[in-house]
């Protein structure tokens, strides 16, 4: 017999970088899949990628470490891809067949969960192509509400997202470059995002996974510990590959 959605597993698996498997009410959504050991000069120094499957994929923006066609292919070319407007052509040329372009406010239903695209503050270009799209976050609603911030800095609408009760917020806390630039959150900014959003659980992402030639610009453990101390009781730190029942 089918498992009722309310009785199905509800879990967050931090795969690493911006890749998270959100399992909710019988549906698994994977965010920004990066499932390779290496992409360009970025090399995975965390443990190998845990196996993941997806009923749909959420893409936040067009940067190569967030929109990676070889990683998407591992999840199947018929898997629905929910993406910013402007990247469908790139994906169709790579033979992906179910592409759903969205802008902030658009909603998509996958199984028993609803996904709403939200704004984000992050560059949307994809060098060396001419692609330049609006970066997104996503709210996933079912028996739990999960907010995936994508890659973002603080932005005016973030507090309004927190007007809705959020069970789990997935918040980026670092970048891989020598400094955390505009359009990103460092641990202090990420803790401020938690204050604005007021989630029950805040899970840091975009840390501890990839670095240029396996040489992180900052100590990842110190980075995540700083976030956890500033974010307070809501913070739940998952190492790459770790799963939390929610």
Q: Where on the chain are the PLM-derived regions?
A:
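Zn-dependent metallo-beta-lactamase
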Residues: 1-30, 35-37, 219-222, 226, ...
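Pre-active-site segment of Zn-dependent metallo-hydrolases
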Residues: 2-4, 21-62, 69-74, 83-86, ...
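Short, polar loop motifs at secondary-structure junctions
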Residues: 16-17, 84-90, 103-105
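A short helix->loop->beta-strand "cap" motif at the edges of active sites that frequently abuts
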Residues: 27, 77-80, 96-97, 198-201, ...
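Active-site neighborhood of phospho(di)ester-bond hydrolases with catalytic His/Asp-centered motifs
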Residues: 31-32, 53-65, 82-85, 147-152, ...
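Cap/insert and terminal regions of metallo-dependent hydrolase folds
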Residues: 86-89, 156-242
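Active-site-proximal loop/helix segment associated with metal-binding centers of metalloenzymes
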Residues: 117-143, 152-157, 164, 168-170
